[in-house]
UniProtKB/Swiss-Prot annotation:
Summary of the function given for this chain in its UniProt record: Structure-specific nuclease with 5'-flap endonuclease and 5'-3' exonuclease activities involved in DNA replication and repair. During DNA replication, cleaves the 5'-overhanging flap structure that is generated by displacement synthesis when DNA polymerase encounters the 5'-end of a downstream Okazaki fragment. It enters the flap from the 5'-end and then tracks to cleave the flap base, leaving a nick for ligation. Also involved in the long patch base excision repair (LP-BER) pathway, by cleaving within the apurinic/apyrimidinic (AP) site-terminated flap.
Organism field: Ajellomyces capsulatus (strain NAm1 / WU24)
CC cofactor: Mg(2+)
Protein name in UniProt: Flap endonuclease 1
Residue numbers binding Mg(2+) 2: 179, 181, 233
Length: 395
């Protein structure tokens, strides 16, 4: 699920933190990819009749098709991926997972009903909601990656948290996931849309955490508190607290402890905190997740030459993929994994930290930019109001 409305807040308050670019801009970089999130996106890539891709025997192959060809595209562009798979979810997440399961059960019933009486759009909508990544999907994707020579890691719990560890240690350039909570786990850089298909023509979004914190004028603890208030995988949001209110509450009070105190002591009782709302435990999961350290043996990974005959046996003989396409893809994989060994020039230079004076100048510029945006918004609203109040036919 990730963090509700976080990207919107970053766009509005820290636009300089987001850089949109092409996949080829990341040539020569190593990237840790959230495997479970990627597999889910492959599974919902359904056909027009609302069905997943399957083999001749009826086995689902959407996850393998996506993993094979999207990974190939990544490697074609000189990127070296390492996939990270989810382990057991934290106990605090069980409530959210139970709700997801309930929603999927309800969607399955609605899907059956839509097939009988609904439109094609309704069938597809409910079909997407019933999708679930199974252990079998994960195991088949791991088998495929091994045959491709692409490394993977099993995280103890959350894949995003393990990706963040690798990024902080410099073992990879960035963590790649669609889940914005990757930033809460302290990943310096988050890449979004990396595993999207080329046909979607979505730019790769590169989000820098230090610029997010600078733009929001928050430290990491306040940022995590904001994300919890927005609604995360561990806790429901507080009813009636939207993104703008959440941001204002953290800015006004500085921490969730103070926000909770202010809400409870408000005589108007504008907001009600849910009875079971263990925000301190949720915060602890972001600050101290169950992860393997970057120097752990399980976090040692390397890229190997693909096992071409193994790929043919698995994808062609067992899953009915086209042999010509698989062999051609394996040849590209072999060639491009070698090309990706080339280093980027930036790897030879260390970034110079900004001085306090430079930080102050940047902060002032950012505040001036926000003031101009607010002023323009007010002027636009005023002009709109005046235009509405004018009788029709006048100029």
């Amino acid at each position: 699920m990730g963090i509700k409305h976080l990207y919107q807040i970053i766009q509005e308050n820290a636009p300089d933190a987001v850089k949109a670019g092409e996949i080829k801009n990341h040539f020569g970089r190593k990237v840790a990819i959230d495997a479970s999130m990627s597999i889910y996106s492959f599974l919902i890539a359904v056909r027009s009749d609302g069905q997943q891709l399957t083999s001749e025997t009826g086995e689902t192959t959407s996850h393998l098709m996506g993993m094979f060809y999207r990974t190939l595209r990544i490697v074609d562009n000189g990127i070296k991926p390492v996939y990270v798979f989810d382990g057991a979810p934290p106990k605090l997440k069980s409530g959210e997972l139970a709700k997801r399961f309930m929603r999927k059960s309800e969607a399955a019933e609605a899907h059956e009903e839509a097939k009988e009486v609904g439109t094609a759009e309704e069938v597809e909508k409910f079909s997407r909601r019933t999708v679930r990544v199974t252990r079998e999907h994960n195991e088949e994707c791991k088998k495929l990656l091994k045959l491709m020579g692409v490394p993977y890691i099993d995280a103890p719990t959350e894949a995003e948290a393990q990706c963040a560890v690798l990024a902080r240690a410099g073992k990879v350039y960035a963590a790649a996931s669609e889940d914005m909570d990757t930033l809460c786990f302290d990943s310096p850089i988050l890449l979004r849309h990396l595993t999207f298909s080329e046909q979607r023509k979505e730019p790769i979004l590169e989000i820098h955490l230090d610029r997010v914190l600078e733009g929001l004028d928050m430290d990491r603890k306040q940022f995590v508190d904001l994300c919890i208030l927005l609604g995360c995988d561990y806790l429901d949001p507080i009813p009636k607290v939207g993104p703008n209110t959440a941001l204002k509450l953290i800015r006004d009070h500085g921490s969730l402890e103070q926000v909770v105190e202010a809400i409870k002591s408000d005589p108007k009782k504008k907001y009600t905190i849910p009875e079971d709302w263990p925000y301190k435990e949720a915060r602890e999961l972001f600050f101290d997740p169950d992860v393997r350290k970057a120097d752990h043996p399980d976090c040692d990974f390397k890229w190997e030459a693909p096992d071409v005959e193994g790929l043919v046996k698995f994808l062609v003989e067992e899953k009915a993929f086209s042999e010509d396409r698989v062999r051609n893809a394996a040849a590209r994989l072999q060639k491009n994994l070698k090309t990706a060994q080339q280093s980027r020039l930036e790897g030879f230079f260390k970034p110079i930290a900004k001085t306090e004076q430079e930080k102050a100048v940047l902060k002032r510029k950012h505040e001036e930019k926000l003031e101009l945006q607010k002023k323009k918004k007010k002027e636009d609203a005023k002009a709109k109001k005046e235009a509405k109040s004018k009788p029709r036919g006048t100029t």
